[in-house]
UniProtKB/Swiss-Prot annotation:
Keywords: Host-virus interaction. It comes from Tomato yellow leaf curl China virus. Increases viral DNA accumulation. Enhances infectivity and symptom expression. Disulfide bonds: none annotated. This is Replication enhancer protein. Signal peptide: none annotated. Pfam families: Gemini_AL3 (PF01407). It comes from the Viruses. Homooligomer. Interacts with the replication-associated protein (REP). Interacts with host proliferating cell nuclear antigen (PCNA). Interacts with host retinoblastoma-related protein 1 (RBR1), and may thereby deregulate the host cell cycle. Oligomerization and interaction with PCNA are necessary for optimal replication enhancement. GO terms for biological process: viral process. Belongs to the geminiviridae replication enhancer protein family.
Length: 134
């Protein structure tokens, strides 16, 4: 949903993409939170945010695009190591597809968390997307 207007995204907006080799460093990755064994449970909660860079947003007609995932995992990784592996696998998946779009990024989340990384318990995805109105 477009967080500015409240309208649902159309299929054309979510599938609109650009070739991965036309944009340098198209995505920014950062871990915003890492709760290690909260409440003495046997899992970690990691929050990852993926941001589209300026050139990618310009090509797609997007004002702002933050894709955030809150991951419950049985793994107990170091924050930097988890981010490095996640980023590498995410970009590798998109590189194999050849096109970066909002839907392909969401598919990459699912692929990396459920098919590549073992120990994923649950994932909550949140999106903050604003398209250019003008």
């Amino acid at each position: 949903m477009d967080s500015r207007t409240g309208e649902l995204l159309t299929a054309a907006q979510s599938e609109n993409g650009v070739y991965i080799w036309t944009v340098k460093n198209p995505l920014y990755f950062k871990i915003t939170k890492h709760h290690e064994r909260p409440f003495l449970r046997n899992h970690d909660i990691i929050t990852i945010q993926v941001q589209f860079n300026y050139n990618l947003r310009k090509a797609l007609g997007i004002h702002k695009c933050f894709l955030t995932c809150q991951i419950w995992t049985r793994l107990h990784p170091q924050t930097s190591h988890f981010l490095r592996v996640f980023k590498y696998q995410f970009i590798k998946y998109l590189d194999r597809l050849g096109v970066i779009s909002i839907n392909n990024c969401i598919r990459a989340f699912s692929h990396v968390l459920y098919d590549v990384l073992n120990g994923t318990i649950d994932v909550i995805e949140k999106h903050d997307i604003k398209f250019n109105i003008y």
